Design a protein with these regions (language model features):
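Intrinsically disordered, low-complexity serine/threonine- and proline-rich regulatory segments
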Residues: 1-20, 99
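Basic amphipathic alpha-helical segments that dock to polyanions
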Residues: 58-65
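Basic, amphipathic "hinge/linker" alpha-helix immediately C-terminal to the N-terminal HTH DNA-binding motif
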Residues: 80-100
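Short, well-ordered turn and helix-capping elements at secondary-structure junctions
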Residues: 43, 47, 75-77, 90
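N-terminal helix-turn-helix DNA-binding core of bacterial DNA-binding proteins
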Residues: 13-57
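Short amphipathic alpha-helical/adjacent loop interface patches that line ligand
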Residues: 43, 62, 96, 100
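Beta-hairpin "wing" of winged helix-turn-helix
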Residues: 66-82, 87
Length: 102
């Protein structure tokens, strides 16, 4: 019984964090386009360091948002490298607005 409760708590916490992270990223993307590194830094700063999502975890969330049609990307040359900028789509804006109303 205790194991089931612990597992349920862990799953609930994971789902809450995932949903909150998606919402916060969309909220930031509503302001402007960001590339992943600066998006990670802004999320950490704005959440008073409660959300420190970096590297693979951040890309997993961004790819999931992209698969849902909530985020699009564009490439931009920055010196010798190409930066991928993320942009909230109209569907992402609608999704975010509905979440904020609920």
């Amino acid at each position: 019984m205790q194991k089931n409760i612990e597992q349920h708590i862990a799953e609930t916490a994971t789902n809450f964090k995932r949903g909150t992270a998606e919402m916060l990223l969309l909220f930031l993307l509503k302001e402007r386009d960001w590339y992943a590194y600066e998006l990670s830094k802004a999320l950490k700063a704005r959440s008073l360091e409660h959300f420190d999502i970096q590297g693979p975890s951040l890309y997993t969330i961004l790819y999931r948002l992209q698969d849902k049609g909530f985020v699009t990307t564009r490439d931009e040359q920055a010196g010798k490298r190409i930066r991928v900028y993320y942009h909230i789509s109209p569907a992402g804006e609608t999704y975010l607005e509905r979440i904020m109303r609920e």
